[in-house]
Structure formats: C-alpha cells, structure tokens
C-alpha cells in the first residue's frame, strides 16, 4: 500500500471546482499528500473546504508536535519505532474524523510516518473475532498523560459509562494546567461518520511490550481478547497493510483520522537540535462538541 500523492496546484482554489471527485478519491485512499506544497494557512483552509473536513467553527484542535521532545521522552527500545501504532485521541466521545498535517520544519535526521487502514483490517477479521469485536467495549488511556494504570483499571471497572479522570503534570505534548480528562468507553468497532464503513477503533502495542504498558482496556476480558489482540498485532506487523511516507519540509498530508492508525520511526541518527516540527489541525464530526 502507498500513500497517494496529489499534484500541487498553483492556485489551490481550483480544487473547489472538482471537490466531489477529490472527496471520493480521498475516502478511497484515506491518506493523501501534497509534497513540498508551500501552502499557507489560507490555502490549507481551502483544502479543508474542498475535502469537506469542516468549517471554522468545527476546528477543534490546532497544535504542534516537536519530535525531539517525544524522542527524549521515550526510553530507547529494541526497535525502530518511537511510538506504537495508535489512533488519534481515541479516548474522546467524538474522536477526530479528519486532519491536515503540515511539516513546517525538518532537520537532518531522517524519519518516516506510517499509516494502516483499520477499516480494511475490519474486513479481514475472521467471523468469530468479528462477532467479538462488534460486541466489545474498550477504554483508551488518555495519550501523553502520566497515569497510574492500575488505578485507572479500578476506575474503569466493567462499566461502559463515561467518567472523569484526574491528571497531573502532563508529559510533553499534553495540555498544561489541565486537571482532568473526560474518558469515554466506546465500541471496539464503530461506523465512520462520513462513509459509514465499519472501523476497528483501538490502540495497541507494536511491537508487543512497547513502553512496557498496555494502552487499551477491554471491558470483555475473556479468552477471546487474547485471540483478537494477537490477530491484530500480526496484521499491524504485516508490511502489506502498511503505508509509509518519508517526511520533508513543506509536505502537507490529509488523513482520515477516524479510519487510519499511524506510527513514526527513525531511519538515521537523531538530530542535535529539535528541528522537526509537525503542525496539526484536526476536525471532529460536524456538530460534535
């Protein structure tokens, strides 16, 4: 699988003339890139409108990721991934549906971003695991917050009701001053709010044991859980399911965040300075608060 690359238009407003076709291509590809586009903020908002991601009122998150902070915050492991395959903000009641990512700066160290279509993996599920997944609720730990996992498990219990969880001293990438997060258990399989496609909505460890912690709590902790997570990790490890993109400065990526999980890995030695910065703009389901 490959990330689909679109031609960089001299006048990005031309996209609005064939927005219906572009949206169809996007929902088929799930991840598209405009290489070294040089698009400014106004032009990125034209992309948003052309692909139907939302409006000014729907823009819910706008933030930067400094990869140096992330790299230094994670202990060196026996593998090349600096974070496991994950879905964005999977603990929220309304997780992000669409996103525009722009690599605003890029240093000497090489790296790649990886993507996997979780809707495609749902279609590959064996019948017994598909039945299990469609009837199971899970709770994702709020990403980037240092959490007492044993206490978190006790708070979750076996209820699928939402709850508030206190957080202290957010890790790099967190939100300073935030005292708690609202956590929502959700079905393991959900329908995409735009396309209606069924999607496996989970975060998992890859390789197994990454961080030494499990980032997902299954409310159905039967033997089927082990069968399901074993199958899922095997599929996530399969290169045939992975799409990889070598980042460069000025690259703009449009991503179906509801359907696609992602990861990051380094190819070369890490840099001496924090020069690799990714600007994120995420949109939720229209009307979701």
Question: What label would you give each PLM region?
Answer:
Residues 2-249, 258-289:
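Non-heme Fe(II) oxygenase catalytic core, chiefly the N-lobe of the double-stranded beta-helix
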Residues 254-256:
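Short beta-strand segments
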């Amino acid at each position: 699988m490959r990330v689909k690359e679109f031609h960089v238009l001299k006048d990005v407003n031309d996209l609005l003339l064939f927005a219906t076709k572009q949206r169809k291509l996007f929902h088929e590809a799930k991840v598209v890139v405009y290489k070294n586009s040089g698009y400014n903020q106004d032009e990125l908002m034209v992309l948003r409108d052309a692909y139907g991601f939302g409006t000014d009122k729907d823009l819910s998150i706008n933030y930067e990721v400094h990869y140096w902070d992330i790299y230094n915050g994670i202990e060196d492991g026996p593998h090349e991934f600096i974070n496991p395959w994950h879905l964005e903000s999977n603990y929220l009641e309304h997780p992000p549906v669409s996103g525009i990512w722009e690599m605003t700066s890029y240093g000497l160290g090489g790296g790649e971003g990886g993507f996997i279509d979780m809707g495609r993996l749902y279609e590959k599920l064996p019948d017994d695991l598909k039945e299990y997944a469609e009837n199971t609720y899970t709770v994702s730990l709020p990403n980037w917050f240092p959490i007492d996992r044993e206490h978190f498990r006790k708070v979750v219990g076996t209820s699928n009701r939402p709850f508030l969880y206190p957080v202290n001293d957010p890790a790099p990438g967190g939100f300073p001053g935030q005292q708690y997060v609202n956590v929502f258990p959700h079905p393991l399989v959900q329908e995409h709010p735009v396309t209606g496609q069924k999607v496996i909505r989970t975060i998992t460890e890859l390789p197994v044991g990454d961080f030494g912690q499990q980032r997902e709590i299954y409310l159905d902790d039967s033997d089927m859980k082990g069968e399901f997570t074993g199958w899922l990790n095997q599929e996530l490890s399969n290169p045939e399911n992975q799409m990889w993109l070598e980042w460069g400065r000025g690259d703009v990526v449009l991503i179906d965040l509801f359907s696609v999980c992602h990861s990051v890995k380094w190819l070369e030695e890490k840099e001496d300075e924090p020069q690799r910065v990714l600007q994120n703009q995420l949109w939720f389901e229209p009307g979701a608060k």
